[in-house]
Amino acid sequence: MTSPLWVVVPAYQEADRIDGTLTSLAAQTDRDFTLLIVDNGSTDGTVERALRFAATAPFPVEVLTEPERGVGSAVDTGFRYAIDRGATMLARTDADCLPHPGWVGAARAGLRGGAGMVIGQLRARRDETGALGRASFRALVVLANAMGKLRPSNRDSAFRAPYRMHAGNNMAITADLYLAVGGMPRQPAPTDQIFRNRIRRHTPAVAYSRSMVVENSIRRLASYGVLGTARWYLDQGSRGLDPDPR
């Protein structure tokens, strides 16, 4: 018997893209999970699309509404809701992302293998850009990771795990570790660095999985440019740009 695993997807104004995310989750090779979609106040039909999918999904689906604005609040509400209902493993992606078919299986394998948190590989969505755009996105990930390693706030001697940049849209964590570090900051994005460093102070059990692949929307790259997007992924904010470029 498998341990309960829930996939949590925060969503805001994603009526144009959430169908792709849900289709990708339905195509997982490991479908022994419950899907929880946490809507953050959408007015564009996102919730209706989620409910339509739930009616025929190949796994249990629940849809919540989180009125407190911010992806951190939506994720925290979703994770705690899942934990209260027996989840021991939690995976997260976003409503504009496309998890590859082995994503859930890789997340489960990483957590079962002893990791407290597993972070995966990010790629650009193939339906949003060509080869040049995907190469630019790969360069962005490398740049953001290199910049992050140099930041003083990521180099504290109290950290028990080495720095590696990750985006919240491709991660998995045990329920015990999530609760032990106090959960996701309940605030608007960016939140990933705060959460990541809470984990790094608490445990060395952070793993990277090349098999845990998510295709990421490049809307932010198109809106901010490479350096601006790198700053965003480093949790330095949007520097006056629209923090939610939909």
Regions found by a protein language model. Give the residues of each.
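N-proximal low-complexity "stem/linker" segments adjacent to membrane-targeting elements
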Residues: 1-24
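Short, acidic, metal-binding catalytic loop of nucleotide-sugar glycosyltransferases
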Residues: 23-32
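A conserved acidic beta->alpha catalytic loop
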Residues: 39-48, 97
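Glycine-rich, basic loop-to-helix element that forms the pyrophosphate-binding segment
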Residues: 66-85
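Short beta-strand-to-loop acidic/aromatic patch adjacent to the donor-nucleotide binding site
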Residues: 86-98
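Conserved donor NDP-sugar-binding/catalytic core segment of glycosyltransferases
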Residues: 102-134
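Short, flexible, basic/aromatic active-site loop/helix in glycosyltransferases
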Residues: 120-127, 136-163
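Acidic donor-binding loop at a coil-to-helix junction in glycosyltransferase catalytic cores
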Residues: 189-195
